[in-house]
Amino acid sequence: MVYTTPQQQQRFSSTPQSSHTLIFSPIRAPSMQTPSSLDYQSPSIVVSSSSMKVHGRSSSFGKFSLSIGQNGKATILGPINVLPTDTSKMEKPVPKKKPVTSDRVEKTRILSLLKKMRNKSSTVNKKYSKVPLKSTTSLQPAATAPSPLVSNIIKPSPKKLASPRTPNANSNLNLNFTSFQIKTGFTPNLDGILLENFTSPNTTADSQGNSASNIINNNHGSANNTNQFLFNLPLQSSPRQFRSPARLIDPLPISDWNTSLLMSPPRTTNFESANNHFNSNFAQASMLRRPSLPHIDEVIPQDSNPANYSDRSDYLSVDQNANNHNGALSEQTYNNIMKSSMISLPIEKDDATMALRKLVSRE
């Protein structure tokens, strides 16, 4: 908005001297005055439109004058030719330049700050990106050290693990485990193999002639066959069979153990050496082996008459003429041999039954 100050007003003038003046008419004379005093033309009130003009409109808007006649009526006259004002000077965008410059300064400042931030972030990223590269380059020569032992331990090659020429510790353990099973004589069908060996004619001939002598030699002459046993402990070849529950848990009583054999260190076996005496002892032990199915023997009372029971030597008697022409054993001889393997000791010699009897008597 452009504000203009009004200049000094001139009365009784028909035309205004400036475009920004307000001309007012004098006070009307009373009616009692002479008409000669009313001969003059009534001055007009000229209102400049420039004072009412709003900033931003065009300068073609005309200027009007308001005149009051003798009769007291006001009339609007046409536009008066007034010198045009310099709107270019008034409408100079001087205040607009200042915000433009300030905006530019702010924009440049913001851009410079953004550039600085980008530069800082790039430098930081470069620093962090360079650190792992240096660490990896420093670790690479350490990993590829000239010492062969460290490199083999850290990075073992898969070919060496899979090669059969250089077995691992696991393969060695497996080999030792299988050899240990072979040394102990582990066989799944042991009962069937023993029966086949027992029914052969060679074993029957040896067992009929030297059954008692083989048992005694096996008990007293185990020192001669120490290299055949893995832990110097012979098989149980005695005809004593125990059918009590305690004997099933511990089939070999403590009285039958040979402490000197158990305390001795283990020795290496020699399975390739042929020993007839060992084979005969094994055959005798297979003869006296009890069957796989459980069997409950009759317990002889302590106060009973032994004359009522048959002598146990009858069970040990084997028919010499029991062999058939083909060399196979008859059913009678087989039954007699199986009965001889089921001979039970008297109650006084059975530790388990004595212990049970003591418990019952205490109750």
UniProtKB/Swiss-Prot annotation:
The Gene Ontology biological process terms listed for this entry are: G1/S transition of mitotic cell cycle; regulation of transcription by RNA polymerase II
Record PTM Phosphoserine, positions in chain: S157, S292
Region called Disordered, residue ranges: 1-20
Write the record's keywords in alphabetical order, separated by commas: Phosphoprotein, Transcription, Transcription regulation
Is tRNA-binding one of the keywords UniProt gives this record? no
Q: List the GO cellular component terms.
A: cytoplasm; nucleus
User: Domain of life here?
Assistant: Eukaryota
Q: How does it assemble?
A: Interacts with transcription complexes SCB-binding factor (SBF) and MCB-binding factor (MBF). Interacts with SWI4.
Q: What does the miscellaneous comment read?
A: Present with 861 molecules/cell in log phase SD medium.
What is the protein name for this chain?
Putative transcriptional activator MSA2
Source organism of this protein record: Saccharomyces cerevisiae (strain ATCC 204508 / S288c) (Baker's yeast)
Q: Which gene encodes it?
A: MSA2
